[in-house]
Design a protein with these regions (language model features):
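Accessory DNA-engaging acidic/polar modules
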Residues: 1-106
Length: 106
């Protein structure tokens, strides 16, 4: 299983959670929609997001993204010291870090 740094976690103006993996090969994520579980690749933002963001709490969506990338693409997404938090409140950042620190979701 490959480790993949998360370049940024963003909450945009519409409240969507976007997770941008640190990757030179965006085509790896382009077809994540084929998993048919509500995720898609935002080509403009180079990030994974929910097709219908209103269905998800941010913590649940992050868990879903991590599990899908792990199971479908064989990559473990990890926050690093270089991960940018864009439009994310300190409270939400703590919540999302807690979600990720609980180990690999099953």
């Amino acid at each position: 299983m490959n480790e993949r740094a998360i370049a940024s976690v963003e909450v945009d103006a519409r409240g969507r959670l976007l997770v941008r993996p640190e990757s030179e090969n965006a085509s790896l994520y382009e077809y994540i929609y084929r998993e048919a579980n509500g995720l898609r690749w935002d080509r403009e933002r180079h990030a994974i997001c929910a097709h219908d963001a209103s269905r998800w709490q941010h913590g649940d969506l992050l868990t879903h993204i991590v599990i899908t990338v792990r199971d479908a693409l064989g990559e473990n997404l990890k926050v690093t010291a270089a991960t940018a938090w864009v439009g994310v409140s300190p409270e939400l950042e703590r919540e999302l870090l807690e979600v990720l620190s609980q180990g690999q979701p099953s």
